[in-house]
Regions:
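Short active-site neighborhood of thiol/selenol oxidoreductases, capturing the structured segment around
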Residues: 54-76
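C-terminal motif of bacterial Sec signal peptides marking the signal peptidase cleavage site
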Residues: 2-4
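Thiol/disulfide oxidoreductase modules built on the thioredoxin-like
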Residues: 112-119, 124-176
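Non-globular targeting/processing and membrane-anchoring segments
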Residues: 6-7, 178-190
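Structural microenvironment flanking redox-active thiols in thiol-disulfide oxidoreductases
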Residues: 77-115, 126-133, 169, 184-189
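Alpha/beta-hydrolase fold active-site loops
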Residues: 62-63, 93, 141, 151
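N-proximal helix/coil linker or "cap" segments that precede and/or mark the start of modular domains
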Residues: 6-43
Length: 190
């Protein structure tokens, strides 16, 4: 089972989904795809709630970028797992979370106030430029690993267990292969 949301929800639908029962179990079995390996990180600028801007192509080093939304239940489940991953892999890869919420800081700031996610940035793309760069709107969550040159290594569509040892191995192995080192094992995500 693949747990995911689409980016096409209207504002009213987004608010309804955000109020969904949080006790609902989410299957964390995202799908790893290498179909877009080698593509450059999108030329998109995101903002944070304070108005700071970040051009994604200006980010240095390897990046694990997660496109999510507050109304996407699988995304919400993933956020604490990504926060833990960001802490564990600090200095190895930069974890960027980018919200696709249409209302931007109005809903993103309260989300971060509610959940303790000290290792995750609060980037937003309320115009959905990033989603459109991924061919008009991917399923959410979408997590893409980029190497130090800003080239895609792989992407995972749907919710994934970022707290697992295998998740850390997937990221580290992919980055070591990109750096020219031989991998120890084959990727375990299907």
């Amino acid at each position: 089972m693949l747990a995911a949301c689409d980016t096409g929800a209207e504002e009213e639908a987004q608010e309804t989904v955000a109020a969904a029962d949080e006790s609902e179990a989410i299957d964390l079995t995202g799908t790893l795809l290498r179909d877009f390996a080698g593509e450059r990180i999108p030329a998109v600028t995101v903002i944070d709630p304070d108005g700071a801007r970040l051009d994604l192509r200006d980010v240095d080093g390897p990046v694990l970028m997660n496109l999510w939304a507050t109304w996407c239940r699988p995304c919400v489940v993933e956020m604490p797992l990504l926060d833990e991953l960001a802490a564990d892999l600090e200095g190895e890869v930069r974890v960027l979370t980018v919200s696709a919420d249409l209302k931007g800081a109005e809903v993103v700031q309260p989300f971060f106030d509610r959940y303790e996610l000290p290792n995750l940035p609060r980037w937003m793309d309320s115009g959905n430029d990033l989603a459109n760069a991924f061919d008009g709107g991917p399923l959410l969550p979408l997590t893409v690993l980029y190497d130090a040159e800003g080239r895609e290594v792989w992407r995972i569509t749907g919710a994934y267990d970022w707290a697992s040892a295998s998740a850390r191995e997937e990221v580290r192995e992919a980055l070591s292969v990109e750096a020219g080192d031989a991998p120890d094992t084959n990727p375990s995500v299907s």
